[in-house]
Regions:
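Conserved NAD(P)H cofactor-binding loop of Rossmann-fold oxidoreductase domains
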Residues: 6-11
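Active-site helix of classical SDR
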Residues: 38, 74
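Active-site loop immediately N-terminal to the catalytic Tyr-X3-Lys motif
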Residues: 16, 65-69
Length: 189
């Protein structure tokens, strides 16, 4: 038995500009749907057989992220849930691997946001096929977390050495600028 929880949604922009419906949608899809799918598959699984779960979180799960506050927090929930569930399932032959990629070029909007980040967007983004194949390799080896790309792993490590308030400030400055470039490109006031 295996399950890959890959669904997720984000509405970039300041929290105060998000509608309650947008906030609920992020929580429903990024958290509630994942928990429901996970619980359902665990209820159906044959405990005499190996079980692998892959949850797609985000590199954002490691940081407080202005302009992506709801998304980053929802992905942090998913990371913490996955690590805890991994320990619960370990004695019963289950493993949980959490994928934490940077931007993924999956839609025109995602590509626009990656491009708005300039060089950092280009060097942190990995090909979807590459990430999928490597994620499966890591899951089969029983790894707990997979962060694709050396630059992303270095960013994760550096983020752990800096006080969270400074991380939030630096990310807010960086993402705020990228967000403004996306809004200009899309002709959104």
């Amino acid at each position: 038995w295996s399950l890959i929880n890959v669904a997720g949604v984000d509405y970039e922009g300041p929290f105060t500009e998000r509608t309650l419906e947008q906030i609920r949608e992020v929580i429903r899809l990024n958290i509630e749907a994942n928990l429901e799918m996970t619980r359902t598959i665990l209820d159906l699984r044959d405990e005499s057989k190996e079980f692998r779960l892959i949850n797609v979180s985000s590199l954002a799960s490691f940081y407080p992220m202005p302009v992506k506050a709801i998304y980053a927090a929802s992905k942090r929930f998913l990371l913490d849930f996955s690590l805890a569930l991994r320990e619960e399932l370990r004695p019963r032959g289950g493993t949980v691997t959490t994928l934490c990629p940077a931007g993924m070029p999956t839609t025109a909007g995602a590509i626009c946001r990656i491009n708005a980040q300039g060089l950092m967007g280009r060097i942190t983004t990995k090909n979807v096929g590459y990430v999928a194949a490597r994620t499966l390799d890591h899951a089969l080896k029983g790894h707990s977390i997979y962060i694709p790309g050396l630059v992303n792993r270095i960013l994760r490590m550096m983020g752990g050495l800096i006080p969270p308030t400074l991380v939030a400030h630096l990310i807010g400055h960086r993402w705020g600028g990228a967000y403004q470039r996306v809004m200009k490109t899309a002709n959104i006031p």
